[in-house]
Amino acid sequence: MTVFKIVLILIAVVVVGVVALILFALHKESNYYKYTEAVGEIEQKYTAFGDKEVSCQEYDANDDVIGKYAVWYPSELESSNTQYPVVIFANGTGSTLSTYKPFLTHLSSWGFISVGNDDENTRTGASLEETIKFLIAENEKKDSIFYHKIDLDNIGIAGHSQGGPAVFNMVTNQEHGSMVKALYAASATSSYHTMVMADGWEYDISRVNIPTFLTAGTGSWDAGNATSKEQVTD
């Protein structure tokens, strides 16, 4: 066998290996719940996929910032007269709804209408506000599959990273903030950013008066040491 053929074989093996790793990573991301080692009874139950099949509809938002809305929902909704509770998600910096598709699909498997959009800078809560307005309108459209099937009395919001300030600002600053019944923030960005960037990152969590669930990781991005007194008191 010539050196050239050996090199080609080695290149082919490497390419196949890389492709396999990429495909596995994508599979693992979409099926993250299968690889999560939940400990508590509640965590074990809800980490698993729910018993409902899930469908998705996309809508043009007619807004360059928001881009589009995507709505995941239990497939049974289309032939049901039941109203379903809602979770609206605020993206982290530079992320679009495709990043969180597995999470939103998972929520809908447990009976929620889960909604995202393509806003990559969510911190003010404005795109969450527009999403609620969109849902109110869809709930009143007789030709919509969501006509009178959205439980507007049970809306929760969630956000990751910059989406943390978004959920806080949604309930404290936006017109329909009072419609939100609970919020969740994962690795919420510090309001300390406001002092550095002065571009709308501020929020006042002391004004939030609804059930709130906050989580963060233990790595340096989430749990690094404060480097100033302002960060300590944030």
Which residues are covered by each model-predicted region?
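Gly/Ser-rich "nucleophile elbow"/oxyanion-hole loop immediately N-terminal to the catalytic nucleophile
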Residues: 78-83, 126-165, 173-174
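N-terminal Sec-pathway targeting helices
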Residues: 1-16
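Short beta-strand element of the alpha/beta-hydrolase
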Residues: 81-92
